[in-house]
Curated annotation (Swiss-Prot):
Belongs to the ycf35 family. It is found in: Plastid, Chloroplast. Keywords: Chloroplast, Plastid. GO terms for cellular component: chloroplast. The gene is ycf35. This is Uncharacterized protein ycf35.
Length: 130
């Protein structure tokens, strides 16, 4: 029996979510969903991770964030569900930190992964004072 679960996430930015999936080398596809709100057509972009058993994993936009929808009993990814979420969250956060920091003039100069799986990113700015 199939039981799909919606997991609340903090993934709010499609660009960073796609970058995180790419870093984990997890293939996905974009899926546009038409929404007819107040007679004006809008589209949500959801991400689908195809699985060979046809129980695909999806990230559905709920208007605020991407919810992870999956059936854990049919999960066939290289990582267990909890590990997948942790790794994806870490790559997502790293991407947000680096991208947003670059917008204000910082560049990553060092990145270190610790034994516990956490990362430390060192940022610097090349601002010269006269």
């Amino acid at each position: 029996m199939s039981h799909f679960t919606n997991l609340k996430t903090s993934f709010k930015n499609l660009f960073h979510l796609e970058n995180a999936l790419n870093k984990l080398e997890i293939p996905y596809k974009r899926e546009k969903k038409a929404i007819d709100a107040n007679n004006s057509k809008h589209h949500n972009v959801n991400l689908v991770i195809p699985q060979s058993n046809n129980y695909d994993i999806t990230f559905n936009w709920n208007g605020e964030e991407y919810e992870l929808v999956l059936d854990a009993s049919f999960w066939i990814q290289p990582y267990p569900v909890e590990s997948f979420i942790n790794k994806l969250s870490q790559h997502y956060a790293n991407d947000v930190i680096i991208t947003e920091s670059q917008k204000i003039g910082f560049q990553p100069v060092k990145s270190k992964q610790h034994v516990d799986g956490s990362n430390t990113i060192t940022l610097a700015t090349l601002e010269f004072k006269k």
